[in-house]
Design a protein with these regions (language model features):
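Short glycine/proline-rich, acidic loop/turn segments that cap or connect secondary-structure elements
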Residues: 54-66
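Terminal low-complexity regulatory extensions
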Residues: 64-66, 90-93
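AAA+ P-loop NTPase domains with strong preference for DNA replication initiators
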Residues: 1-56, 72, 76, 83-92
Length: 96
């Protein structure tokens, strides 16, 4: 039982770290969209960040950030990791 709980916690922590990394990417996207003068956190992903910034609006980016934050909250509240990630992934799809 204890091992099962530790395993679930490790999975949740790993997913949360990945979501924090994703938030950092969207922070960079938003910074480009609003013309911020700060440096990119994800310099290795500058091309991808630039493309996302060009292909979306700052409102879409803010909505995506909110969806990622919601996913993090649901994980902490013992949400099913697969369902949480699926819901978030659907919300992050590019808008037509």
């Amino acid at each position: 039982e204890d091992q099962k709980r530790r395993s679930k916690r490790a999975l949740t922590d790993a997913i949360d770290r990945a979501l924090i990394d994703l938030l950092a990417i969207y922070r960079d996207v938003l910074m480009i969209q609003v013309g911020g003068d700060g440096e990119l956190i994800n310099t290795d992903l500058a091309d991808l960040v630039g493309q996302i910034a060009r292909d979306s609006t700052h409102r879409q980016t803010l909505a995506r950030v909110e969806h990622i934050e919601t996913a993090r909250k649901r994980l902490v509240s013992n949400g099913n990791p697969l369902l949480v990630l699926e819901d978030m992934a659907i919300s992050l799809r590019p808008q037509a």
